[in-house]
């Protein structure tokens, strides 16, 4: 397994302005902005204004359903159904066309993730959670540490994803090797909100939930969260650390919009 590791270094404003070829006036203006923000108490004073936009590393914490963890098994019989026992295989034998990225196979991929009891870890997209990958994610997103014990007990050694990672993992799936190869096949590494916005930017269909057609493989969106519509009123979503990948009824989940994903071919 290859792990992509990205290191973020402290910002050097002078070096950044040199790289961007700022002239003297632009340097003065940018320097004033930088000092105002970073050398004042503004960030601390107004931090509450930004709390709503801070990602929830535990997943869709707005869910009000069952609180028991669902790491595979027969499901709880509630509105959030867990999948089957853990299975790390990816089977594309039932895909309609593995050589394209299409809505029917996206739905089949999502259903398989549910049936195979995939787990949830922020920043993952369907690969098997190894010790090295978990350590990297703990470094990358320290807030995950609050759920480390649960992740180790339930998800280590199993395939994991976050909400929009379920879509990206399908997009990055290599049909020849059955590996999930990061940032391939034209599928961008967007978060949930950015992925939904891309529908408008690329001219694909999107709207509020009252107009949603019954087409499998549609993207479902609400602020900070993503799901895949699989037909008959159901969605598959990587709900959160305590739930993993589950099946839920679309109605009553608070979805704000649907879209045809620009990077998926729709054969209605």
Task: Tell me the role of every PLM-derived stretch.
Residues 128-153, 179-211, 266:
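Surface-exposed intrinsically disordered loops and tails
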Residues 66-73, 77-179, 223-225, 236-238:
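N-terminal capping segments
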Residues 212-219:
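Short, hydrophobic/aromatic-rich segments at coil-to-beta transitions
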Residues 1-97:
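Cell-wall glycan-active module
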Residues 24, 44, 101-108, 193:
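Generic alpha-helical secondary structure signal
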Residues 253-268:
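Low-complexity, Gly/Ser/Thr/Pro-rich intrinsically disordered linker/tail segments
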Residues 222, 228-252:
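Catalytic Cys-His active-site segments of thiol-dependent hydrolases/isopeptidases
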């Amino acid at each position: 397994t290859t792990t992509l590791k990205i290191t973020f270094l402290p910002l050097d404003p002078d070096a950044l302005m040199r790289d961007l070829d700022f002239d003297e006036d632009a340097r003065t203006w940018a320097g004033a902005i930088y000092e105002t923000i970073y050398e004042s108490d503004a960030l601390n004073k107004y931090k509450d204004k930004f709390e709503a936009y801070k990602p929830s590393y535990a997943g869709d914490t707005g869910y009000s359903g069952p609180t028991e963890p669902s790491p595979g098994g027969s499901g709880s019989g509630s509105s959030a159904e867990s999948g089957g026992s853990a299975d790390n295989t990816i089977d594309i034998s039932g895909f309609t066309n593995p050589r394209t990225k299409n809505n029917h196979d996206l739905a089949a991929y999502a259903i398989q993730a549910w049936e195979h009891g995939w787990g949830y870890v922020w920043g993952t997209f369907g690969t098997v959670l190894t010790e090295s990958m978990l350590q990297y994610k703990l470094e990358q997103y320290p807030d995950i540490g609050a759920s480390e014990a649960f992740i180790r007990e339930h998800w280590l050694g199993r395939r994991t994803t976050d909400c929009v990672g379920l879509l990206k993992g399908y997009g990055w799936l290599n049909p020849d090797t059955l590996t999930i190869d990061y940032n391939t096949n034209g599928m961008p590494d967007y978060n949930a909100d950015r992925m939904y916005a891309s529908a408008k930017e690329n001219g694909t269909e999107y709207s509020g939930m009252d107009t949603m057609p019954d087409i499998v493989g549609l993207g479902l969106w609400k602020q900070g969260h993503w799901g895949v519509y699989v037909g008959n009123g159901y969605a598959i979503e990587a709900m959160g650390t305590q739930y993993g990948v589950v099946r839920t009824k679309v109605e009553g989940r608070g979805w704000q919009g649907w879209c045809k994903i620009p990077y998926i071919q729709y054969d209605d």
